């Protein structure tokens, strides 16, 4: 008998750290967690701090915190002042010079929440990639989550980078998001943009597919028992399926004349439709960022002002957008001190 005596191979610090990060625990950490957890903690902490204590009086001329009497709908972490341009507004930067109160007054919390929020969303998507690889499944969950990631990046980073300053990005609040939507309609005619139309079709189509799918599966569950509650009609660990794909196929074949023939096509379609419903408007927002004038009538209005022979249809859509611009220019950008004479204010045909 031969006995070999030797040293166990030395493990480097990287291997030790890799094992610790990927250890099976209640809340998985992983390499993605090094990005996700700190940035998500700071983004949420910044948002709760801003909505609770920080005013928007110096940036937007409004109250925006619970301390000032706002509620959940009206509280927000507002964008920085227009004069700040695209500065990162670092706490130690030339604007705030290390003064935390001054930093909050200038809107530094918005850039803090936006940048940390962006990295936390990317970290969450990477987390889904990492866990999918470890458990041996395909990474389509991460692919689906790319939808919210690109929507966030398009609205909160790319759009204001194409505009004059961070001021024109959405603030982090409920009413603030609706203000941003109104702004997109009035200044970009967003609802006429085909990328917005594709987004509506994708999101509403995805919701419809989700409802139809859930109802169809419930309708075709095998009746494994006499219990009225469907959850008591099957064993969560059973090998066989609990519903009939054949029956579902027969039902929809009778309804539409066509039906999905297998679950792969069905579930790929349920993945594709809503994800495209998030990617397409994100592409459209990039177009708005650089002020593409294809669908907003402004180019027609400019030509009509220069060329008396050029005719345009003055529709209710144009009236709506002019009204939004006349209202929001004054109320939304008080630092510009806009004053519009009566003769340029939009009026309907009845006035």
Swiss-Prot record:
InterPro entries: D1/D2, Photo_II_D1/D2_sf, Photo_RC_L/M, Photo_RC_L/M_CS, PSII_PsbD/D2. Its EC number is 1.10.3.9. The gene is psbD. Fe cation binds at residues 213, 267. PSII is composed of 1 copy each of membrane proteins PsbA, PsbB, PsbC, PsbD, PsbE, PsbF, PsbH, PsbI, PsbJ, PsbK, PsbL, PsbM, PsbT, PsbX, PsbY, Psb30/Ycf12, peripheral proteins PsbO, CyanoQ (PsbQ), PsbU, PsbV and a large number of cofactors. It forms dimeric complexes. GO terms for cellular component: photosystem II; plasma membrane-derived thylakoid membrane. It comes from Prochlorococcus marinus (strain MIT 9313). HAMAP family: PSII_PsbD_D2 (MF_01383). It is found in: Cellular thylakoid membrane. This is Photosystem II D2 protein.
């Amino acid at each position: 008998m031969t006995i070999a005596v030797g040293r166990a191979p030395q493990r480097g610090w990287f291997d030790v750290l890799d094992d610790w990060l990927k250890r099976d625990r209640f809340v998985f950490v992983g390499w993605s967690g090094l990005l996700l957890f700190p940035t998500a903690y700071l983004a949420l902490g910044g948002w709760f701090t801003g909505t609770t204590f920080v005013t928007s009086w110096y940036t937007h001329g409004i109250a925006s915190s619970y301390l000032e009497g706002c509620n959940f709908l009206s509280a927000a972490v507002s964008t920085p002042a227009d004069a700040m341009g695209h500065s990162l507004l670092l706490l130690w930067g030339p604007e705030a010079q290390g003064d935390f109160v001054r930093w909050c007054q200038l809107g530094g919390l918005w850039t803090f929440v936006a940048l940390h929020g962006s990295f936390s969303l990317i970290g969450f998507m990477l987390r889904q990639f990492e866990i999918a690889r470890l458990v041996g499944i395909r990474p389509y969950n991460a692919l689906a989550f790319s939808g919210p990631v690109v929507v966030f990046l398009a609205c909160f980073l790319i759009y204001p980078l194409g505009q004059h300053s961070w001021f024109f990005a959405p603030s982090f609040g409920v009413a603030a998001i609706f203000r941003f939507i109104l702004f997109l309609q009035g200044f970009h005619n967003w609802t006429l943009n085909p990328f917005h139309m594709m987004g509506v079709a994708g999101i509403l189509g995805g919701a419809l597919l989700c409802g139809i799918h859930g109802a169809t599966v419930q309708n075709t569950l095998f009746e494994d028992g006499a219990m009225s509650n469907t959850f008591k009609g099957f064993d969560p660990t059973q090998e066989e399926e609990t519903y009939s794909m054949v029956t579902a196929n027969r039902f929809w074949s009778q309804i539409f004349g066509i039906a999905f023939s297998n679950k792969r096509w069905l579930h790929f379609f349920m993945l594709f439709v809503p994800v495209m419903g998030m990617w397409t408007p994100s592409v459209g927002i990039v177009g708005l960022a650089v002020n593409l004038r294809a669908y907003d009538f402004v180019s027609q209005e400019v030509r009509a002002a220069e060329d008396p022979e050029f005719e345009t249809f003055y529709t209710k859509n144009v009236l709506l957008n002019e009204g939004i611009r006349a209202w929001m220019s004054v109320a939304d950008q008080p630092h510009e001190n806009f004053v519009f004479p009566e003769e340029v204010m939009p009026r309907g045909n009845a006035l």
